[in-house]
Amino acid sequence: MSHKSAEMYELKKKVEELKSYRGRATELVSLYIPAGYDINKVMQQLREEYGTAQNIKSKSTRKNVLGALERAMQHLKLYKQTPENGLALFVGNVSEQEGVSDIKLWAIVPPEPLNVRLYRCDQTFVTEPLEEMLRVKDAYGLITVEKNEATIGLLRGKRIEVIDELTSNVPGKTRAGGQSARRYERIREQETHEFMKRIGEHANKAFLPLLEKGELRGIIIGGPGPTKEEFVEGDYLHHELRKKVIGVVDISYHGEYGLRELVEKASDILKDHEAVKERQLIQEFFKHLVKDTGMITYGEKEVRKALELGAVDKLLISEGYDKVRVRAKCNNCGWEELKTMSEGEFHVYKKQLTHCPKCGSQNITFEKWDVAEELIKMAEESGADVEIISLDTEEGQQFYKAFGGLGAILRYKIQ
């Protein structure tokens, strides 16, 4: 997986965190500086906003906005020029206790160039420009066709979406002979033609907007019999969409299962696509597990050890993995404890650990960081590949449920 994919994963987690905060008033500052924009002009704007904010009537809101702007200006002094892809700053009081100030700052250099210049002070952080970067833009159109039913879908990233399911009234074959049989066959052919037209209309409606936006990479069509070839060869799809047909595949199922089978059977056509690569990767992991080769490991403690030894070839992290590493330290006697837990468990742990278990002091501080980000950094330092496993595939769900969403394929066995 590319370094950019790991960056996108980290960006997604930061966006989710930013969206979880809500200010008590319009006091959360979002600042987007596009690539190539003069950072001195931004500083000048913030000074003007600082002057305006001094007129805010509410004392607590005024204090929080001024504090956020001061922190933002202080941070911008670290930059001689805007980073290559631009910069997004989010600053504000995120304390859940009224009257308590806890001004935090997030500085994000995005994995793609920012083209938005924005300053906003609101109750929530503005994350839409970053969310647009996270949106998977490339898509493949999927169509399964039978005589009496069809499914239209999309493969976008690793997710298969069902857009439309259609059924027809095409009658089955008859055993009658003579003119009755010929009349019956003409009716059947006409019904089939009308159904094909309807499939084409629905496919055009689904795929043409994507084609116009430059997001449609190709169309794959599947089905159990010759109907799929009749559909492809007939004048049913828009002529521009017909040019995008990159494969016609034999499949057995219809509906959502049919779309999944279509993607699986078209793996040669889609060999460079994320969903196919992910399936092959998880299959490789399971193969080592079944054969007990000793060339995989899973679980946070085991994966961390393998990374420290430089034994990891591919680090596998599920999108659903959400553990944090927490260090509790007594500033009186020096006692400390290091644990891995979920975000929810951390809030309980912090409330319960009010006194040092060694000396009884209440002077305890907590340090918290994201386990996935820490392990990704360790992997990159040791030259290991990082693979983010989605929850949009059956294999991805299985990896998350069975192994907690964290595993590794090794370079060599660990004794």
Curated annotation (Swiss-Prot):
Coiled coil: none annotated. Keywords: Cytoplasm, Protein biosynthesis. InterPro entries: eFR1_2_sf, eRF1_1_Pelota, eRF1_1_sf, eRF1_2, eRF1_3, Peptide_chain-rel_aRF1, Peptide_chain-rel_eRF1/aRF1, Ribosomal_eL30-like_sf. Its main location: cytoplasm. The keyword Cytoplasm applies. GO terms for cellular component: cytosol; translation release factor complex. Belongs to the eukaryotic release factor 1 family. Heterodimer of two subunits, one of which binds GTP. Directs the termination of nascent peptide synthesis (translation) in response to the termination codons UAA, UAG and UGA. This is Peptide chain release factor subunit 1.
